[in-house]
Amino acid sequence: MAHINCTQATEFILVGLTDHQELKMPLFVLFLSIYLFTVVGNLGLILLIRADTSLNTPMYFFLSNLAFVDFCYSSVITPKMLGNFLYKQNVISFDACATQLGCFLTFMISESLLLASMAYDRYVAICNPLLYMVVMTPGICIQLVAVPYSYSFLMALFHTILTFRLSYCHSNIVNHFYCDDMPLLRLTCSDTRFKQLWIFACAGIMFISSLLIVFVSYMFIISAILRMHSAEGRQKAFSTCGSHMLAVTIFYGTLIFMYLQPSSSHALDTDKMASVFYTVIIPMLNPLIYSLQNKEVKEALKKIIINKN
């Protein structure tokens, strides 16, 4: 391949969600409110689980880690996105862009794998209740969280290094509100075929394997629930798993739409709307999904409020 002489970009300009000035301030207020709700909801859930001894179980250990990932996930993206509404040009340095992409990928992959760990936890709890505390020991729980974090960090690091070893000389204007792969690849003057193949392969393998764990776990769970003689037991099992199923459907559904589609149909404006959903909306929704239908969380919150009063 012939060498292309070009000046390497040292910074990028994030276009943001809209160019319409009249929309920027209302959107700033809206997304700031959502972000504050996300921070309060997720950190509040973590503190509640830590404060109430009745919630010191494997299920809530995983839930507190999911809340932590959601908090970090949103915090990597939203503050910079809010800057898009306040500044004429939202500039991000080359290194900061790489850091944002790496952190974003770390927490996105972590969330995907944590949802699979939580599905396995629910499988053991419902299908083998007598062995639950024997199987889900503190050591096993830590491993089911540590492995996703470690794997996610290594994958994100390799992925980010591949992206930022490319030459960026066509333009430095990123048609997005954060540093993401597809908008960045459109700016490079390097051959991106290997990189695009890597994105598709990694996303496909990770999503399919984690979804397979979730699917198989829930096949056994549903089978076990249908065999229960107690209507109350069935209702409790369904309510416990229903929250997780809803969170899984929303998260994986959005990511499949985003990453497992042909590049020819990869419209960046459509991707921006999907990205808002899974980087801003989902981290806000998860505390609500897992709390509103959970009697134990609501009881723990009531106890804290009563004790303070």
Swiss-Prot record:
Record's keyword terms, sorted: Cell membrane, Disulfide bond, G-protein coupled receptor, Glycoprotein, Membrane, Olfaction, Receptor, Sensory transduction, Transducer, Transmembrane, Transmembrane helix
PANTHER family in the cross-refs: OLFACTORY RECEPTOR
Record protein name field: Olfactory receptor 8U1
PROSITE patterns reported for this sequence: G_PROTEIN_RECEP_F1_1, G_PROTEIN_RECEP_F1_2
Native organism: Homo sapiens (Human)
Family: Belongs to the G-protein coupled receptor 1 family.
Superkingdom: Eukaryota
Disulfide bonds: C97-C189
Main location: membrane
Function field: Odorant receptor.
Glycan attachment positions: N5
GO-annotated cellular components: plasma membrane
Stretches of the chain found on the membrane's Extracellular side: 1-25, 76-99, 161-197, 259-271
Subcellular location(s) of the protein: Cell membrane
Gene Ontology molecular function, alphabetical: G protein-coupled receptor activity; olfactory receptor activity
Bilayer-crossing regions: 26-46, 55-75, 100-120, 140-160, 198-217, 238-258, 272-292
Membrane topology: Multi-pass membrane protein
Record has Transcription as a keyword: no
Residue ranges, Cytoplasmic side: 47-54, 121-139, 218-237, 293-309
CDD domains, per database record: 7tmA_OR8K-like
